[in-house]
Amino acid sequence: MNDSPAARWTALILIALMMFFGYMFVDVMSPLQALIEQQRGWSPDVFGTYASAEYILNVCGFLILAGIILDKMGVRFTGILSASMMFIGASIKYIGITDWFQTTAFCEWLGTWWVSMPGSAKMAALGFMIFGCGCEMAGTTVSKAIAKWFKGKEMAMAMGVEMAIARVGVFCVFSISPILASKLGGVQGPVGFCTVLLLIGLINFLVFSVMDKKFDGQLVEAGVKSEEP
């Protein structure tokens, strides 16, 4: 199946767009720091703690665990898991910054401990931490998927294209996020928009998984490899 340029580049675009949406979500609140501080009462220290939450578990060894999962379970399982974690984490973060959540008893309870960190920030940090685990796992998975689909083909070029598409997400969100916040009247609009994009990214990877399953079937028939889980 990867002998077809259309098939392998379609596969690349599907997974690259997932990473594009992921990188958009990473920085969606970066240009909105002043707004979130104004609307939710976060201090610069609170914003810094929230932003660092993305990397906490990865620094503590989660990336190594992600590599083990990828080796044991394969590209499809790990990719769907990572895309799901990104979407779930993003949804939790979105809930944490909504106007509705600020009025809940749970948010009030979150504010009763570590009082310098508002309940909304704790909820957003939890979601961002889960998202970060999924995003870094996805990056490793995408690299392995490209190596598989472009073996003996334009592998280096494909990796460069994927990284370029993903990084454009950062440029886009720094431009789009303030506009959405202005149009929608708050920080939750841009975050909600990027959360929906992550759902589309998950769907993209599900489509890729169907293609990858078919590709594996062809490799098994050709005796090149045993079937991947």
PLM-predicted stretches and their roles:
Residues A121, G127-I165:
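Cytoplasmic helix-loop-helix junction between adjacent transmembrane helices
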Residues S84-M117:
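C-terminal ends and interior cores of transmembrane alpha-helices
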Residues T10-P44:
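Extracytoplasmic
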Residues S209-P229:
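Flexible cytoplasmic inter-helical loops of multi-pass small-molecule transporters
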Residues S52-I68:
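Central cavity-lining transmembrane alpha-helices of secondary-active solute carriers
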Residues Q188-F208:
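Symmetry-related core transmembrane helices of the 12-TM Major Facilitator Superfamily/SLC fold
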